[in-house]
């Protein structure tokens, strides 16, 4: 006989709790409302989210879309039972990819999949997503919560995010005038951000430390909490600098692959980025990871951001104006190098100096 007796099986008997899903929707409505912006005034719960480009102030917009996830950083959140900030990471990984193309993030949608839905856990996650949307100035207009028993182990979940932004036609980055001698600026990261966490977890395993242990690199913080420091969202400072100075030629979001994989993505084939590694101020978390795991500098640079989360390319005469605009918005700016000529088939990122780890 089924758990529901003579009435037969229910969806709940199969492991899907519709009531829990409805409760989650009620819990997250205030957070979702807090992300409203011009162009997005609808309520969640419809079949699709709406956005009015004209109301957002665009005349001849080009839409830019990005999607991403948080990777195995989620495993630390699950094991440490700390879910409040991974939603910020989810938004950051998408909207930072939009702003590097000169686009203003407009709206965001999320996908949250789990084996068994915990409404409180889900509300914490979506609360983080809403916080990230507020930081980026985009609206959370919809999402999908999938309870899938048998697909995920107990307590496990995964996240995916989808962001759409816009820029006026002719204002997209990178510009077509990047030249030899242009200066490369770096914006400080907030920590490991959301890449390289499979290696992070392996190093922590080697260290023998638990997630509740004091973080060796962050006084007064637990290891898990410190490693879960959310990814910095660079959107508003960069958009302001773009609009105020008109001098930003290219931006590169330093994610998986580090400097050597990400910087060349925005450069013409005849130019390379010459980075002075001595100028990189490596935060303590990366020094600890390198020492504890015996990770060589080259591997650190192709796995982690090593303290620089965003690259900005400007003409030499505009360095002061762009730096001042970004610093006024709270960014830490460092001059990292310059553009040099690149031979055919040569690397798009070259180094001088030594990384101090």
Swiss-Prot record:
InterPro entries in the record: PurM-like_C_dom, PurM-like_C_sf, PurM-like_N, PurM-like_N_sf, PurM_cligase
GO molecular function: ATP binding; phosphoribosylamine-glycine ligase activity; phosphoribosylformylglycinamidine cyclo-ligase activity
Keyword Nucleotidyltransferase: no
Pathway assignment: Purine metabolism; IMP biosynthesis via de novo pathway; 5-amino-1-(5-phospho-D-ribosyl)imidazole from N(2)-formyl-N(1)-(5-phospho-D-ribosyl)glycinamide: step 2/2
Enzyme type, top EC level: ligase
Catalytic activity annotation: 2-formamido-N(1)-(5-O-phospho-beta-D-ribosyl)acetamidine + ATP = 5-amino-1-(5-phospho-beta-D-ribosyl)imidazole + ADP + phosphate + H(+)
The name this protein goes by in its record: Phosphoribosylformylglycinamidine cyclo-ligase
A Pfam family per the record: AIRS_C
Gene from which this protein is expressed: purM
EC assignment: 6.3.3.1
Localization in the cell: Cytoplasm
A GO-annotated cellular component: cytosol
GO biological process: 'de novo' IMP biosynthetic process; adenine biosynthetic process
Family named by the database record: Belongs to the AIR synthase family.
Classification via NCBIfam families: purM
Keyword presence, NADP: no
Keywords: ATP-binding, Cytoplasm, Ligase, Nucleotide-binding, Purine biosynthesis
